[in-house]
Regions:
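All-alpha prenyltransferase/terpene-synthase fold signal
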Residues: 1-330
Length: 330
């Protein structure tokens, strides 16, 4: 592979070349309805998916444990179920957040309305259980279904914290563990499970994935304080929704009690002037840099654990994935 500073997701996926087409075929069948109108919505979602980080993690961990042998349908099923969970959560998130765009295209709720978007997300969730039951791979279905519960819990806890402006480091890490890290952790764990790795190895893969997932969300929260031309997103979008994330928590940890209280009041206001003041405080107290340090610790933890696996293209790709996620600009 090329230098880690210039690694691309396509290069990371290179060891999976013989399996990606099979996964894509499985996913296309999963996102299908007999209704032509409904199928138009599902095809739109299929055509406008994101980077595919989570199913890639599933397959890389499967490769890590099966020694490069052909995967078989269990792995393609596991990767597809993970991507379906992620896809359904994004459709529902866009409704909750009233988001008009997703991956540079109109969101489903913008294009087809909120009612159809809700039903589309529900349909995708139903396909997860239908595919799992039809395949009789109950161990995989049971394992991945846990994350649906955790995603919902994380959203509700975050909503409560947003209303009270009482976010703390402990609550923040609990929220991102449930909202984001859980799905990446399950992605890695189910990759091992799909090739029938021992339970202890599944747990080990899960732990690595959790560290990657925590870093992934922290990076997202750091990017929210970056310039809009770097991310393609509105600067401080979370603050506009009264969300306190790690860069601000790290900045507030350096403040006096009085200044911290005043800053939380500014978050509650959420207007442009207040956001400008908060942004200046995050810069003043090196909130982004401190958050970067915490993110780097999670990445280092994941990479240290990966060193214990035998050298292989899959291990190399997973190490590169850690660098890719840490260095991404959007």
């Amino acid at each position: 592979m090329t230098n880690k500073a210039h690694i691309s997701l396509a290069e990371i996926k290179a060891p999976l070349a013989s399996e990606l087409d099979k996964y894509e075929e499985f996913m296309h069948k999963a996102l299908h309805s007999e209704s032509p109108y409904f199928n138009d919505i599902l095809q739109y979602i299929f055509d406008n998916r994101g980077k595919g980080v989570r199913p890639t993690l599933v397959m890389l961990f499967a490769g890590l444990y099966n020694g490069g042998a052909p995967f078989g349908e269990r792995v393609h099923l596991a990767a597809s179920l993970i991507e379906l969970i992620h896809t359904a959560s994004l459709v529902h998130d866009d409704i909750i957040d009233k988001a008009t765009m997703r991956h540079g295209q109109a969101s489903v709720n913008t294009k087809w309305g909120g009612r159809n978007a809700i039903l589309t997300g529900d349909f995708i969730l139903s396909r997860i259980f239908e595919l799992g039951m039809e395949s009789l791979e109950f161990d995989i279905l049971t394992y991945v279904s846990h994350t649906i519960k955790w995603l919902c819990e994380g959203e509700v806890i975050q909503d409560e914290q947003t209303k009270t402006l009482a976010m703390t480091h402990e609550r923040y890490f609990d929220i991102i563990d449930k909202k984001t890290a859980s799905l990446l952790a399950i992605s890695c764990g189910v990759g091992a499970l799909a090739v029938k790795a021992p339970a202890a190895e599944v747990d080990k893969a899960y732990t690595i994935g959790r560290a990657v997932g925590m870093a992934f969300q922290i990076k997202d929260d750091i990017l929210d304080y970056a310039a809009a031309d770097q991310t393609g997103k509105p600067t401080c979008a979370d603050l506009r929704e009264h969300k306190i994330t790690l860069p601000l928590l790290e900045a507030m940890a350096q403040m006096s009690a009085e200044e911290e209280a005043a800053t939380r009041t500014l978050v509650g206001r959420g207007d442009d002037e207040a956001i400008g003041e908060i942004y200046a405080k995050v810069v003043k107290y090196s909130g982004r840099e401190r958050a970067e340090g915490i993110m780097a610790d999670y990445i280092a933890s994941a990479k240290t654990a990966l060193i214990n696996y035998p050298a292989s293209p899959y291990r190399t790709a997973l190490e590169a994935m850690c660098d890719f996620l840490a260095q991404r600009k959007h």
